[in-house]
């Protein structure tokens, strides 16, 4: 099914008649008017983290770039981002792509995302265009209670109904190799192609997944190459993919790009070459400068909502590099005009998904309701109410992470607590209930154990240095992690631009310096090391118990490091 503009406006009017909130500005009626252009269209979303329902998600106020990445996309936040892209303050775009005045703007513009609303937009755009592909950049099966409890099945069924045609992955691998193979052999067979050129077996180096596909769109051969997250066995427990090897595989990618361009003698080579990537945007920018023959990189992993493609020059041409945000908040639309065997022009829009501007697709809404029904009572349990603004996003800390850290320290009697620098997890506004579903939206992983250890001060510092280098190494190919680990109970300083091993300093508990040889009781969760595989209770149990005892969550002071050498950096607001 697809929606014409007339049908779309009729659905919008029906929603208003039913009492659903609609913003009153006249331009809202035309917010999703996107005139068709060219003869090939690519629709792309990524990193939805299993968010089937509309939600709130605050963008970061700290997304520092270092080296060549400083003060350029994607490392722009707040007012610097608005100025760079020409967004008006207090506009829908300002709310979608920045953290500015988030609470007030969220109440004004309502929730974002939701697969039923995304489905409506996808149908509208595909009806208006001729040949198109819908691509999913991965991190789709993880991030919610229902996705964890169904081992991703709720999202897999939603992907199929949405019409996804091609996918790559990252967090999706944390259900284990056997589950991934099962989905590809059964659920995806004949409908969705899972592509990854950079995954091979550890024994003989055989490809695990199909590396690329070539589709004919309106007579134009379009090649799509898959690029899974290259550091999956480092960022997550190795046991999930024990027989698979991951990497950037730049050389192999170049060979594939040359191959699909050249054809095989029986048919013409691809006129458009696309990399569906889960590298992260900084990695993609470097890759685009070194690998030739790729027209477009549709990127993910770093959750960067980049409204305008970055054009990267290389030895034989140029590559458009994009990154399409996260949590189902946006849908990227790339229209290409292909003539004479090459792209001669393009149009790109990163469309925010405002739930109050897009009527819910009935078929998708029914599917979501059916998937949630067996768990509805458990999901709806109100464990507490927040008076604080609870969010997770940013290089160093966030209020939701601070809440988890406080819970770890209090419930485990620890001096120090660590919480992973995950980028996923929905946002709660002051006055909203914290349901069990919200607890799970911050913690739903397949290795949730809480760990309590004795750790020497020098070990703590060494660990922080390693994590910091994963984030701030000036060579993007060495940026292997998420954001900086969140820390409770201990203050420290951080110099992102310093050399490896010299970024962390002035570690203190209260006024007392952390001593190198002294041991400290440290609580954490999400252990990657095999030693802690069955170490303790799931973190969601601990957090829910803590919240039930507190009943009300009040604003708390963020434990943000003292930053050195970042004055004037437009990735910090």
Which role does the model predict for each range below?
Residues 2-13, 19-354, 395-407, 471, ...:
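Acidic, metal/ion-coordinating pockets
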Residues 250-253, 372, 376:
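Hydrophobic faces of stable alpha-helices that mediate helix-helix packing
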Residues 355-363, 370, 377:
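Acidic, Ser/Thr/Pro-rich beta/coil linker or hinge segments at domain junctions
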Residues 221, 389-390, 491, 513:
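Short, solvent-exposed loop/turn motifs
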Residues 380-397:
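Glycine-rich phosphate/diphosphate-binding loops and the adjacent beta-loop-alpha structural elements
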Residues 368-372, 543-545:
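Short, Φ-rich (hydrophobic/aromatic) sequence segments
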Residues 80-96, 229-230, 373-384, 435-439, ...:
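Short, compositionally biased low-complexity segments
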Residues 29-41, 45, 51-67, 191-198, ...:
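Feature captures C-terminal
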